[in-house]
């Protein structure tokens, strides 16, 4: 007889099936609701120039190959309003039609005033008219490359185009193929921490808004007094966030989809150099400024291209906050980045997306992969494929229960946590059979021992039950306090049917005597712990 466990949500969530996508929070955890139920974005972002119909045939097979359920793709201001006041949504309609045909959800990336801080995706009539749409001024009074967030003319033009975009979605996407929107992209300014124009300087010398000093617990004063060496950057963060918040409010008034902004990061723990960072963007140390300045934005999110495991963990820690749902809208598509999917799940992430996932022939190494060969693609396809079969159920469980995840650290050491009565440890670089402490049975090192692969994620379903997924990992479940009566009662491989866990087979003997070992075939397991009396 099949062993079953039911995962359910409280009625107030389950009853919202006719509502559009939205993000909800409970007990410090978050869920993206799509069609009324939690949804985990197993996403992939295409290259920057794949936002044309001619490129789409090189996109869908790649998404299918890695079992992605969501595409992140740009729609550029220059693309929909090449002539001021004349809008063309041909590509957007093509995208909607093809996404539906390929059973993919869509996250639209609005490349407008800022794309990686640049105005490159603005229409020609914007980028060539510096009087009407002014750039920032440097300390020396010269034009900088980035548009200033102080210009009402630029804001109104961007907002008008964005509202037209959202209006088109309202009229042509009632089924919510598009589930989320990213207004702008990696905002801010490099090598110039703020606008130094006369108008901006006057604002800089005024008192910091009281709402911000109150939130930060700082005394009143002007920007220099309150923020010291980071004053220019704090100022630019505030006004950039206010600019985008107004765009988001206008767009949501038409169609209230969840909206997030993404951050070009500047190191996981250092205080950034205002002239070296994308000043104005939502880096982790200015998140509180963004939260006060832009309450309409649902999340600030990290774009992660740092390969170091310690740094990735710090970024995930910083952005997974009770007031900020975690999603990773961009991460490198090199093979070693795939392991961080598990750590993101362990932080309760609502989405994860390697960048540059299409077959157009462009690779952004050294940020990402040198090539999308089979081993690279399989590193993402394996975890995505395992979770895809339980995607809704995992998302529900992660919203209702504690989670933990670990990626193989760069030093190959163990990772562990305690959930309730049980200690969970992830070990790496071992064969599936036997113990590394054995001296009587010789073995060669596991081929993957030196490779940056492997990880696991768990959800604690009840006091003694866990849902887990992983690859290239040995998982050990033990009592948090030594207890000779404690044991693994059962390890089940299975699936969900209508929200109920159905056991396909029980792992026992060699499959559990040396920990729970998963190598190159990620699977979802239910682990039941207990004690005999």
Model regions and ranges:
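Conserved, mostly hydrophobic/aromatic
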Residues: 36, 71, 99, 165, ...
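Aromatic-lined substrate-binding rim segments of carbohydrate-active enzymes
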Residues: 56-132, 240-256
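Short, acidic/polar
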Residues: 49-65, 275-293, 311-312, 338-341
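Catalytic-core region of carbohydrate-active enzymes that cleave or remodel glycosidic bonds
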Residues: 104, 246-257, 285-393
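N-terminal carbohydrate-binding accessory modules
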Residues: 16-69
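Polysaccharide-binding and catalytic clefts of secreted carbohydrate-active enzymes
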Residues: 131-287
